[in-house]
Amino acid sequence: DGSLIVAIMNRLLDTKIRLITGYKGTSDQLLALERGEIDGSAMAYSTVLTLRPNLHQAKEISVLLQIGRAKHSDLPNVPLLSELVKSEEDRAAVAVIFDKYEMGRPFFAPTGVPAERVALLRAAFDASMKDPELIAEAKKQKLEMNPLGGAHVQALIDRLYSSPEKTVQRARQLLGTEK
């Protein structure tokens, strides 16, 4: 996803970021950043907080841009990509591409599950996200928890699937996957 973010920034913001690939994961990228092998990286802020919280706390890194519809509470002064994009058409295409970040890693059930069972599963999930033991374990592991309810995730999916064809085509152009 980092290379995708960089490619879209280069296309929409006229940045000239040179992408360096070959790092096996975010830990290797962060190590390369600390060693001065690379000048930056595009990765989840929560990953930095989990793997190298000292980098942000010691102000050894600066977060330049956020992806998504809402700013992280730790980063109120860091702009969203959508705030920097000039046209409404491109903002809509960026939303189609990056709304998945708001969902995180959703849980799904197969098509055809009765509505009352879906409601039960959603209620159980919501309750589990409030479990003090789970929250304590997440904090212990320095994991950020920002659960979204099933209705919210469903609304995001519905919005994506109702995107106008023109917006989807522009998103494909930005991704380099035009038909």
Predicted segments with their positions:
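Generic anion/oxyanion-binding catalytic loop in active/binding sites
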Residues: 18, 70, 110, 142-145
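Short, surface-exposed, polar/charged, turn-prone segments marking secondary-structure boundaries
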Residues: 20-24, 45-49, 68-71, 90-94, ...
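Charged, low-complexity, helix-prone segments enriched in Lys/Glu/Asp/Gln
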Residues: 41, 98-103, 159-167
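Ligand-binding pocket segment of bilobal, Venus flytrap-like solute-binding proteins
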Residues: 1-83
